[in-house]
Amino acid sequence: MNTQQLAKLRSIVPEMRRVRHIHFVGIGGAGMGGIAEVLANEGYQISGSDLAPNPVTQQLMNLGATIYFNHRPENVRDASVVVVSSAISADNPEIVAAHEARIPVIRRAEMLAELMRFRHGIAIAGTHGKTTTTAMVSSIYAEAGLDPTFVNGGLVKAAGVHARLGHGRYLIAEADESDASFLHLQPMVAIVTNIEADHMDTYQGDFENLKQTFINFLHNLPFYGRAVMCVDDPVIRELLPRVGRQTTTYGFSEDADVRVEDYQQIGPQGHFTLLRQDKEPMRVTLNAPGRHNALNAAAAVAVATEEGIDDEAILRALESFLGTGRRFDFLGEFPLEPVNGKSGTAMLVDDYGHHPTEVDATIKAARAGWPDKNLVMLFQPHRFTRTRDLYDDFANVLTQVDTLLMLEVYPAGEAPIPGADSRSLCRTIRGRGKIDPILVPDPAQVAEMLAPVLTGNDLILVQGAGNIGKIARSLAEIKLKPQTPEEEQHD
């Protein structure tokens, strides 16, 4: 970036001119790292800390950031401001040191709000679909030559990054409701994909509280802003009269302003028509499977149409859409002869979905695109509280696959809850009489326990939000083949 471009960018956020050094505690998270990446490209001195290196920290170090793989008071020395993720506790030594030194400590969303303040902000919220919809909107705006800045919770595969600094006036960002911090944002346009019970500890277990928080988020829009909302979702339909802002609805419903019809999935692509008010019908080829992704695309098209983006640019972006990391992420197709001696192959797909609705959507997309495949799922429940709160829903959804292998619950810092563990969930599913789940007690046993259930015409879904993504990549690296002790030692 040349000096003139940097000066222009620094003038966008005038209140931050006195800020020189920004320190992130928990910088390795996708959301934190994305904001740090944008600020690094704007010319700020960036430092941060986390417990272990990952691709996010490597990318930031490539940009000149200083990363500490520990949490120590001296890490915040000389920082102008400290940005903290919701996963970091108040007694973290860096947070304590910052307070003692009277260094401002702010949440991630507060910094995102500062980036958005002097740009045309587009915020994408909702229980499911935020990351993919953010990537779709970003792809359309980039295809239209608008050079947006985007900050996403997942890897935007076309760009190879979670976030990118553009020179245009648009900032497109995923808005996180998990800790209610999206209330800091004041966008011009807000998408709400759906609203379901999740992260209920943030909302005192009160669903009405969660719904009101989404209304409060939408009321952060200016009176001339616009809310784009999925009318197929029963909670959104209920809340629409309370929004108090201009709205555009989308969905398969007949009364949607942007309506999806004639949906058909062929392999990994969706084909459908979008009907828009006062516009010609748009026949879409979307390079992403599933009816849920058609809805995500409808939201993106609604925003782009409102902005006046040319239909041809919209269609090009959706047809060439490369998706996001860990969202129906195709990792390869592998011959089974070296794995278990059988002929044929197995496809390997990695997916982040960890709520029953998300898992259900992934299964439906797999069944629609590959109806003849033996559907094998390796599932890792995420959080004991979520497993407890949605136990019956998980049991119902997971019976839809042909074979289920289940890892232990990924705790995400939570203490175990009796009856909300993987062994109990397997027992409940087995009792329903449809499938016989296989409990995998040790991640190191995955390949060994997976091989015997593969038939030679398989689609393997590796599903969950914990460390299971690393397991998926490991399976791809070894091409599903169980490793001998000698091979493991060599690795």
From Swiss-Prot:
Catalytic activity: UDP-N-acetyl-alpha-D-muramate + L-alanine + ATP = UDP-N-acetyl-alpha-D-muramoyl-L-alanine + ADP + phosphate + H(+)
Places the protein is found: Cytoplasm
Source organism superkingdom: Bacteria
InterPro entries per UniProt: Mur-like_cat_sf, Mur_ligase_C, Mur_ligase_C_dom_sf, Mur_ligase_cen, Mur_ligase_N, MurCDEF_pg_biosynth, UDP-N-AcMur_Ala_ligase_MurC
Pathway field: Cell wall biogenesis; peptidoglycan biosynthesis
Binding residues for ATP: G126, T127, H128, G129, K130, T131, T132
PANTHER family: UDP-N-ACETYLMURAMATE--L-ALANINE LIGASE, UDP-N-ACETYLMURAMATE--L-ALANINE LIGASE-RELATED
Name this protein carries in UniProt: UDP-N-acetylmuramate--L-alanine ligase
Biological source species: Shigella boydii serotype 18 (strain CDC 3083-94 / BS512)
Taxonomic lineage of the native organism: Bacteria, Pseudomonadati, Pseudomonadota, Gammaproteobacteria, Enterobacterales
